[in-house]
């Protein structure tokens, strides 16, 4: 297990991806509450996703931000892109993440874009299919990012030496 990331050591920015109003029907009518899906990141490889629920929107966003800070993880970066292609699944949704060359930009929509920008990824190609629910798309993106391994990590797992000239990610930016 990796060492936990202390959110106080990072300069985190948060971004609200989705706010959902939920109604509970009671004898006197409807009682509304809110659920906020929040992404936090430092733009340098650390990102977290959280869900906050409360009777008021600002409180739900605050709780979502706190929850996201508890779920921070590190994304291995090669320049401003990812080291290799990966497919993240969650529920009925899946997200394909492909590394891109310098100048491509973030080709992603909605929830996927929020996570990638918070992580500091500036050049990437994505495709999300299946579920269009922001919760499922967000969690599929996070699942994909957690599957990423740097060349150094793979070489350590395989017991091989890394030759700098053979790193495929060095041509990307």
Swiss-Prot record:
Source organism superkingdom: Bacteria
InterPro entries, per the entry: Ribosomal_Su5_D2-typ_SF, Ribosomal_uS5, Ribosomal_uS5_bac-type, Ribosomal_uS5_C, Ribosomal_uS5_N, Ribosomal_uS5_N_CS, Ribsml_uS5_D2-typ_fold_subgr
Function: With S4 and S12 plays an important role in translational accuracy.
Pfam family, one: Ribosomal_S5
Keyword Ribonucleoprotein: yes
Family: Belongs to the universal ribosomal protein uS5 family.
Domain remark in the UniProt entry: The N-terminal domain interacts with the head of the 30S subunit; the C-terminal domain interacts with the body and contacts protein S4. The interaction surface between S4 and S5 is involved in control of translational fidelity.
Assembly and oligomerization: Part of the 30S ribosomal subunit. Contacts proteins S4 and S8.
Originating species: Myxococcus xanthus (strain DK1622)
Domain S5 DRBM: 12-75
GO cellular component: small ribosomal subunit
BP GO annotations: translation
Keywords: Ribonucleoprotein, Ribosomal protein, RNA-binding, rRNA-binding
Record NCBIfam families: rpsE_bact
Protein name: Small ribosomal subunit protein uS5
GO molecular function: rRNA binding; structural constituent of ribosome
